[in-house]
């Protein structure tokens, strides 16, 4: 019975990864085609494209780890392999989180309005602020990598230069993974906090705008209010998906003794994979250009499919 549930959980994770590949690949492809045709790309599309590539990279890394852990349940892992796996996971997850936070920061500076000299100064330099935020995050990535590598060196020395990579082993499941998750929670909470802050400030900006409209007896919504609402709808889904991702990390920390159970690990992976896969679908639905291109592709596929079926029926009737 456990084998059936494990296979079902693994199948669900793989489906989520495939959906994430398709969604993020579509975003990257559409933006790259527009970039090639127009010979220029906007700052927003730059962030979306970089975010899509980072999540493709993240999902590919997760898929590789799942495939290896499923096919080879007992693998002797050297110090270099452990560091390599963790570097790819940390690197891809770092840029996935920080680029998403930079996207929220870009929306906030572009849409929100505050009569403050500092805010106006930042608003006039959106590209520099976003680029600077991403560059400063590299320091956190370096620190996170340094801490993880120091921990790996210490533990591998304790286990005589090797670790038995077995999810049923207490050495790796309940100890090694927990420290990794704790570090990820600490460093991942920073971009998540930034996203929450920009989300709350957008709500406050919308509230101030509505209050100002009421004072001037303007009852109909204007363009600025509509822009606030559209961005807030996108930010709400992002915050919820990111909260689900943090839930999966918290589950692994609070119930660390269950990490030796492969079913529990797979369930946490299912919850965590919702964020990079689901957010790409949300971005496609909320972005006008991406949504229009996606609907055009669906219409083209529908036409191809409807023209393909009569040809099959004609060939089958000729055979019989």
Curated annotation (Swiss-Prot):
This is Taste receptor type 2 member 129. It is found in: Membrane. The lineage of its organism: Eukaryota, Metazoa, Chordata, Craniata, Vertebrata. It is a multi-pass membrane protein. It comes from Mus musculus. Residues 1-8, 77-88, 150-185, 255-264 are extracellular. Glycans are attached at residue 170. GO terms for molecular function: bitter taste receptor activity; G protein-coupled receptor activity. Several bitter taste receptors are expressed in a single taste receptor cell. Putative taste receptor which may play a role in the perception of bitterness. Keywords: G-protein coupled receptor, Glycoprotein, Membrane, Receptor, Sensory transduction, Taste, Transducer, Transmembrane, Transmembrane helix.
